[in-house]
C-alpha cells in the first residue's frame, strides 16, 4: 500500500485487529522508506442506502462527509480519532442493517446525533444546533433539558 506521507509503495503491516463484530479489519502499517505509521481499515464493499435530501434530490451516502461533520462538532473536545471512527462504523452498520435502498437525510442526522450524544454532550449540542437550525435560545434550553 502506498504511504500517505511520502508516497513510497512498500509498507509493512505491524499490527492487525479484527473488530468486535468482525465486520472490519484494522491494520497498522509502517512505511519502509520514512518509517511513519498509519492506520487502514479493511471491510467488504457494500452498497449503502441512497440519501434523500430535504429538497428531494438523491446522493450516494458518503462516510467522509459524516466523519467531517462529526470532527467539526468534536473539535477541541477530548474524543480520540479511534472513538470517532468506531462511532462512524456503528452508523454505517445501522444503515446497512436497515436493508433500505433509500434513507432520508434526517434519519442519517439522527444516527449521527445519537452517536455524538454518547461520545460528548457538548459536541452533541453543537451538531444539533446546526442540524436542527435553532432559531432562539428556548430551543437550546429544551435540548439541554433532554440531555
UniProtKB/Swiss-Prot annotation:
GO biological process: negative regulation of DNA-templated transcription
Keyword line: ATP-binding, DNA-binding, Metal-binding, Nucleotide-binding, Repressor, Transcription, Transcription regulation, Zinc, Zinc-finger
Domain ATP-cone: 49-139
Cofactor note: Binds 1 zinc ion.
Zinc finger residue ranges, unnamed: 3-34
Protein family: Belongs to the NrdR family.
Designated name of the protein: Transcriptional repressor NrdR
Record organism: Variovorax paradoxus (strain S110)
